[in-house]
Amino acid sequence: MTDLYQIKAQMRKEHRILKTRKFFRNKSVVIGAAVLLIMLALAVLAPVISPYDPLEVNVVNRLKSPCKEFLFGTDTFGRDLLSRILYGTSISMKVGVLVSGFSFVIGLFLGLYSGYYPKFGAVVMRFCDAVKAIPSLMLAIALVGVMGAGEKNVILTLIIVSIPDITRVARSITLQVKEQTYIEALQASGASNLRIIWLNIMPNVIPTVLVQVSFIFATVVISEASLSFLAVGIPMPEPSWGNIINEGKTVIFQSWWMIVCPGAFIAASVLGLNMLGEGLRDFLDPLTN
């Protein structure tokens, strides 16, 4: 019996090693995770590594091109663009993490229960259909217009817009797992619905939902920047990536760095998150394993 336990323990250890090797061999996951970690590190360390106050106005340095003193140049008010972009990273990552996190929790809950209980699912899916019937950005603009601009309202708006995506994915997987023979056996043996949902169905739903969360994170980064660019998101003079591009659009031919620098951060973040999502899908999806 002891030998059998040792063999099982050794097999589990080897399985973990193989999984770890497969994870790090997936270039999309590694590159995407590296980009995300760098962005999160910049967001956390922004107050420490920013060379200047992002709100400090100095008209003498107005629209200076990139140089040793100002690596990314300055904006129309003489503010250091690197400092503003770093603080903008904090805002974008904060919004992305909060929206993705709350959407994951709420969407997973709604998806599990709507898939397991048909009547409740009918109500939830009508809500999802109503939300997705309107283009996400247009709906976000309308909601922010009603609630008012500001970081909290932007986060709340993007959560509302993002929940249906998680809910639909979670519900779809729940419906598939619910029809499995072992679930029917658990129901016949008298197992509670609560136990079946959270202990037997949820572990099968989580991997696919996590992939969707990474794509939602990327969408949120673009949406937050778009709302700020349209002056209905993070209010000026807060250093959001969208605000910086909005300020730079009037001097685009004179000061290209005001568009290129924040745009590069947006592109890098979205590309990294999409690569992470694609890699996670290859790694976690049982159909590709």
Regions found by a protein language model. Give the residues of each.
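Loop-to-helix entry region at the N-terminal start of transmembrane alpha-helices
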Residues: 83-96, 145-165, 257-263
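Transmembrane alpha-helix signature in integral membrane proteins
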Residues: 81-116
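Hydrophobic alpha-helical transmembrane segments of membrane transport/permease proteins
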Residues: 42-77, 230-238
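Glycine-rich helix-loop "coupling/hinge" segments at transmembrane-helix boundaries
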Residues: 144-147, 158, 174, 222-265, ...
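C-terminal transmembrane helix and the adjacent membrane-cytosol boundary/short C-terminal tail
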Residues: 147, 160-161, 207, 211-217, ...
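Generic hydrophobic transmembrane alpha-helix motif, especially the helices
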Residues: 71, 75, 107, 112-116, ...
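Transmembrane alpha-helical segments of polytopic membrane transport and secretion proteins
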Residues: 1-34, 275-289
